[in-house]
């Protein structure tokens, strides 16, 4: 039915492309006109187009400038007058963006034609020759492709990109012009792999760069960001448009700041997001790196906005006692319970076999279900389930016990120590497990949380104890609860680390560290860490040093980060399957752009085997057959472990091959360069998926092109399509074939029920293969189930973050106002007014004058002139106005007093050392806390300057916001965890979170306002004989000791997504143990490192043998 409608009315994408066709013709007309121009005249077109843009926007730009000038010239405007002006500026900025899009649409044909003709000239002529400009001369000093010959500059068509020399041989096709327009219009362009998406991006990047508001080109990894920026840069630089890449430079560096000032900035999604968070932790506007969020173009948009959207960006820092933990102490208990559970599972498997042999399917089913609940990934269990009929027995039993909302499942779990739910990535202790890990001589409640509510009520009602005893008992109860909560959490994370995370699949051990492998890209997420104690648990599990715990300082989801842009667009080869999500979350349309040449790749139906052993043998046989034909082969695997297994199998068969995985990423460029040669076998994880362009030699094309072999279906159809897309690029020949077994994760969890029954019914024996469209469709349905599950998680994550986002917008706007200063005075006046209003109305209804007076003294340090008589008779509005004017007058007098007190010192410093001192540090205190104020000496010395007042207000506002914001984030994190229990009360946790979160935020805003205002009113220079100011000496730039993190939101399977954070350390690297591989004799001298980082050197092995066996330390080589 849908096919008939599509034939009658056409597809949405088809209709979109039809609308763009007239524009393609106009671009090509302009392109033909440019042929008659010389290279200098072609270059002059850029300034001509800029002139058109400036002329169309000159009127609105003039109005904006007039409003800013009004604020600068009239610092004493009232609150209401300032508010009106700032609202007018904001409105004009929005209007300017609309007008800008109109003028860009007007000049689009000329702009696209300029880029296309520049590409043509390089391709056909090999060089461009123009009159040298200052930018040409500067570029020639650092780039070999630009040479200055006399007064001319010669731009060669050869240059370096990612260390490899490239020769420009590309020119934009019509379909690429269409792709460029789709991107410019703020939509997603789906273009087949090999269709030149990197080249397509040059068209809208050039056009939008002419607006001089910044263009951000976002990629999935730093290799692509650096490569693409260097590859495409000359196309822009020839026209005077600057290009840079943020991933080439350190965070917070001057070089990165300059990269953002470039007209076009390339970088990875994570770094763009983290720079935004870092900017919102800066204390000086000169420390900011980003300049706004105007236009973002996201390469591999589905990977960035969908796959990575499950991972909120988080900056975290140290917490008090963060190095104190019980991982090493509790680890042996987890190891013991794991061993006991495995013994139990083995018993169940033996019993199941016995029952099956006796024809007792019901009893066998219960034993199998217990084994499956206790350890679903246990290899002997998986092996047994692959036998004919066994899987269906398990499923039948599971359905029976899951009936009526898992009513009978407790019967199954009763004898187990813990239960694993693979589909939801959860593991929980049973009562038997808790009893087991509690020693016989220990308190039975060691791992049991007390009922805090009822216990507190008991203490409160106990009339036999004094108030002092009541307070002591309450403190002891709360302390006991906190300790037990942390201990239980540590145990839970250790259990997760041992049962849900697999070495060489979810993480690898390199350089004495646990390094996470990104399941989507197969790359090491270098320096990133899981948070919430999970990474520490993995470190304890793998016997490497356990790092310190952290707390959140700043956070944002990628969804909310990218939604800040005025215009957002993206490109990928695989977006259509997620079209609904793009529309719903980002309001982005997907347009499928036709290929330039038809795809010649042959995509075979999946080959399905019963066991992984059969599957890998079949893969090896297929590789042998393909290499004998002289075809290059790319073997895609889902983990480092599988890539190494296949490598060993091929070595045994004497097949020469190369491996690309997270451990061997340094060889990536060399491996990719070789992968297109005849007979070359490349085994790769998902690293060889997105963005990898394998160039085929003529011999390879003649032998049938690149053969893709997938060793397992990924949970996402898009990752499979990306792997297939490495072959058949630009009309090249090629083929793809996936090999699947019923033991694969995807099949085991979601897809193998019907296939297993079908294979059993048809009598398939071990080693036989099934290949049918029905099977491929069944696998695709399984993938859809996972994708739907993941979409639900992402949407839920976004709904939670929307609560935080509305709060973040308010706070970051206030921080920005404080940094830039222009709107800060208005914010402070509003704070003072709100506090005056709150104090008056809070006491007015009850006529409690004493309360009003006490709060005034407490916050403002002011005894109000308003008498009790006036307070009781006047209206509340009159009292607010009168009180506000009085308080404001006191504040102005306070600032004047501080200035008079410090002015002589400033004048003397300027007179004696003004030539050498630029900024000075002035200490301020409110009697409790000290804050250093930094201000320029030259401005402070001017008697009519407001520099001191502005510096005091800025630094105090920033310090107070930052101090309370991190505490508020912790409270919101704790709230998010606690509201999940609302589900047991038949309440929606999200609604509870929204309500409670709003109440927390109101409390937070009041606290911040009161703290800022109180500090401003009470702040003074510490009492000394002289004003204690000092010169601000330039310190070398140091990396801040915090981590950037990504909070994994969980896929349907795979430990690497188990609802945890992933952290990126930016603190200085610490010495790590180089773990020794040798086995020592008992009297040998050895060196060991303990879990706390301490080292014992040249000590006899037998002296530390017990510690080594109990995993308290590791052998190291020095």
UniProtKB/Swiss-Prot annotation:
EC number(s) stated in the UniProt entry for this protein: 7.4.2.8
Domain of life: Bacteria
Compartment(s) of residence: Cell inner membrane; Cytoplasm
GO cellular component: cell envelope Sec protein transport complex; cytosol; plasma membrane
Membrane topology type: Peripheral membrane protein
Keyword vocabulary terms for this entry: ATP-binding, Cell inner membrane, Cell membrane, Cytoplasm, Membrane, Nucleotide-binding, Protein transport, Translocase, Translocation, Transport
Major enzyme class: translocase
Annotated segments matching region Disordered: 1034-1056
SMART domains linked to this entry: SecA_DEAD, SecA_PP_bind
Pfam family, one: SecA_DEAD
Binding site for ATP: 176, 194-198, 693
Cysteines engaged in disulfide bonds, as pairs: none
GO biological process: intracellular protein transmembrane transport; protein import; protein targeting; protein transport by the Sec complex
Molecular function terms from GO: ATP binding; protein-exporting ATPase activity
Catalytic reaction list: ATP + H2O + cellular proteinSide 1 = ADP + phosphate + cellular proteinSide 2
Record family assignment: Belongs to the SecA family.
Function as written in the Swiss-Prot or TrEMBL entry: Part of the Sec protein translocase complex. Interacts with the SecYEG preprotein conducting channel. Has a central role in coupling the hydrolysis of ATP to the transfer of proteins into and across the cell membrane, serving as an ATP-driven molecular motor driving the stepwise translocation of polypeptide chains across the membrane.
Assembly, per entry: Monomer and homodimer. Part of the essential Sec protein translocation apparatus which comprises SecA, SecYEG and auxiliary proteins SecDF. Other proteins may also be involved.
Protein name: Protein translocase subunit SecA
The species this protein was found in: Cytophaga hutchinsonii (strain ATCC 33406 / DSM 1761 / CIP 103989 / NBRC 15051 / NCIMB 9469 / D465)
């Amino acid at each position: 039915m849908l096919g008939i409608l599509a034939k009658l009315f056409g597809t949405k994408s088809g209709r979109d492309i039809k609308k763009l066709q007239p524009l393609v013709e106009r671009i090509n007309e302009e392109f033909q006109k440019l042929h008659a121009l010389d290279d200098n005249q072609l270059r002059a077109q850029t300034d001509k187009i800029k002139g058109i843009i400036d002329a169309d926007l000159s009127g609105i730009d003039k109005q904006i400038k007039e409003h800013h000038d009004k604020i600068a010239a009239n610092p004493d405007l009232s609150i209401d007058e300032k508010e009106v002006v700032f609202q007018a500026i904001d409105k004009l900025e929005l209007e300017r963006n609309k007008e800008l899009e109109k003028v860009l649409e007007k000049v689009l044909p000329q702009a696209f034609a300029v880029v296309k003709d520049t590409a043509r000239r390089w391709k056909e002529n090999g060089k461009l020759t123009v009159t040298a400009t200052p930018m040409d001369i500067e570029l020639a000093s650092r780039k070999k492709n630009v040479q200055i010959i006399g007064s001319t500059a010669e731009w060669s068509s050869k240059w370096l990109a990612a260390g490899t020399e490239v020769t420009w041989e590309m020119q934009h096709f019509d379909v690429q012009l269409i792709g460029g327009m789709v991107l410019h219009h703020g939509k997603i362009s789906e273009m087949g792999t090999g269709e030149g998406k990197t080249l397509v991006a040059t068209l809208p990047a050039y056009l939008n760069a002419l607006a001089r508001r910044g263009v951000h080109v976002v990629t999935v990894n730093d290799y692509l960001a650096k490569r693409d920026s260097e590859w495409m840069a000359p196309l822009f630089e020839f026209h005077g448009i600057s290009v840079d890449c943020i991933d080439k430079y350190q965070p917070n560096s001057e070089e990165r700041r300059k990269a953002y000032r470039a007209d076009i900035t390339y970088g990875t999604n994570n770094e763009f997001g983290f720079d935004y968070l870092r900017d919102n932790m800066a204390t000086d506007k000169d420390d900011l790196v980003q300049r706004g969020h105007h236009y973002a173009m996201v390469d591999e948009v589905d990977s960035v906005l969908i796959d990575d959207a499950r991972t909120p960006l988080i900056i975290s820092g140290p917490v008090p006692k963060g190095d104190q933990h019980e991982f090493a102490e509790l680890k042996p208990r987890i190891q013991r319970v794991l061993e006991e559970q495995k013994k139990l599972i083995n018993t169940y498997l033996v019993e199941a076999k016995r029952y099956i042999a006796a024809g007792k399917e019901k009893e066998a089913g219960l034993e199998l279900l217990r084994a499956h609940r206790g350890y679903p990934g246990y290899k002997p269990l998986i092996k047994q389930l692959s036998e004919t009929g066994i899987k269906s027995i398990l499923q039948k039993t599971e359905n029976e016990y899951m009936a009526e909302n898992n009513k009978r499942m407790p019967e199954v779990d009763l004898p187990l120590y813990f239960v694993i739910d693979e589909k939801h990535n959860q593991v929980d202790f049973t009562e038997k497990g808790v009893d087991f890990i509690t020693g016989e001589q220990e308190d039975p409640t060691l791992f049991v949380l007390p009922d805090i509510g009822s216990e507190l009520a008991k203490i409160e009602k106990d009339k036999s104890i004094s108030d002092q005893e009541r307070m002591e008992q309450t403190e002891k109860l709360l302390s006991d609860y906190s300790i037990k909560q942390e201990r239980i959490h540590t145990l839970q994370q250790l259990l997760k680390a041992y049962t849900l995370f697999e070495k060489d699949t979810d993480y690898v051990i390199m350089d004495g560290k646990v390094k996470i492998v990104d399941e989507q890209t197969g790359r090491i997420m270098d320096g990133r860490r899981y948070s919430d104690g999970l990474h520490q648990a993995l470190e304890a599990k793998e016997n490497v040093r356990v790092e310190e715990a952290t707390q959140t300082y700043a956070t944002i989801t990628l969804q909310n980060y990218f939604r800040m842009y005025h215009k957002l667009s993206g490109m990928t080869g695989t977006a259509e399957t997620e079209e609904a999500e793009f529309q719903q979350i980002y309001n982005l349309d997907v347009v499928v752009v036709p290929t330039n040449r038809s795809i010649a790749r042959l995509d075979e139906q999946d080959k399905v085997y019963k066991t992984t052993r059969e599957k890998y043998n079949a893969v090896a046989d297929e590789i042998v057959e393909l290499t004998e034909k002289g075809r290059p082969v790319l073997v895609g695997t889902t983990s480092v472990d599988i890539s190494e297994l296949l490598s060993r199998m091929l070595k045994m068969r004497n097949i020469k091959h190369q491996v690309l995985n997270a451990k061997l990423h340094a060889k990536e460029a060399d491996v990719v360069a070789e992968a297109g040669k005849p007979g070359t076998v490349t085994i790769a994880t998902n690293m060889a998926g997105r963005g990898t362009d394998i160039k085929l030699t003529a011999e390879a094309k003649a032998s049938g092109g690149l053969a893709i072999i997938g060793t397992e279906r990924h949970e996402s159809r898009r990752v499979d399509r990306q792997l297939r897309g490495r072959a058949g690029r630009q009309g090249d020949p090629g083929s793809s074939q996936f090999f699947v077994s019923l033991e694969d994760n995807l099949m085991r969890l979601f897809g193998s029920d019907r296939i297993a029954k079908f294979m059993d019914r048809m009598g398939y024996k071990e080693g036989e293969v099934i290949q049918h469209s029905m099977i491929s469709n069944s696998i695709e349905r399984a993938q859809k189930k996972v994708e739907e599950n993941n979409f639900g998680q992402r949407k839920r994550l976004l709904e939670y973050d929307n609560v935080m986002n509305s709060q973040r917008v308010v706070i970051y706007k206030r921080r920005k106002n404080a940094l830039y200063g222009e709107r800060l005075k208005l914010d402070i006046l509003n704070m003072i007014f709100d506090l005056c209003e709150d104090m008056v109305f809070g006491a007015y209804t009850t006529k409690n004058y004493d309360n009003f007076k006490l709060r005034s003294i407490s916050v403002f340090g002011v005894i109000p002139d308003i008498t009790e008589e006036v307070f009781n008779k006047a209206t509340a509005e009159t009292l607010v106005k009168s009180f506000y004017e009085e308080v404001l007058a006191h504040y102005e007098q306070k600032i004047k007093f501080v200035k008079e007190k410090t002015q002589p010192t400033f004048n003397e410093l300027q007179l004696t050392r003004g030539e050498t001192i630029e900024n000075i540090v002035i200490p301020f205190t409110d009697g409790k806390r000290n804050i250093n104020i930094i201000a320029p000496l030259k401005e402070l010395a001017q008697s009519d300057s407001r520099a001191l007042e502005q510096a005091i207000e800025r630094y105090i506002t920033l310090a107070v916001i930052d101090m309370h914001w991190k505490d508020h984030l912790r409270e919101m994190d704790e709230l998010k965890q606690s509201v999940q229990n609302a589900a047991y009360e038949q309440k929606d946790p999200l609604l509870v979170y929204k309500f409670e979160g709003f109440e927390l935020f109101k409390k937070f805003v009041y606290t911040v306002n009161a703290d800022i205002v109180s500090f401003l009113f009470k702040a003074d220079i510490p009492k000394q004989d002289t004003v204690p100011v000092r010169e601000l000496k330039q310190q070398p730039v140091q990396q801040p000791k915090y981590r950037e993190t990504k909070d994994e939101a969980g896929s349907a399977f795979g430990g690497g997504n188990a609802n945890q954070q992933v952290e990126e350390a930016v603190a200085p690297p610490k010495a790590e143990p180089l773990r020794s591989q040798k086995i020592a004799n008992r009297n040998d001298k050895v060196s060991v490192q303990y879990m706390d980082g301490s080292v014992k050197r040249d000590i006899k092995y037998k002296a530390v043998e017990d510690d080594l066996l109990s995993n308290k330390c590791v052998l190291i080589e020095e």
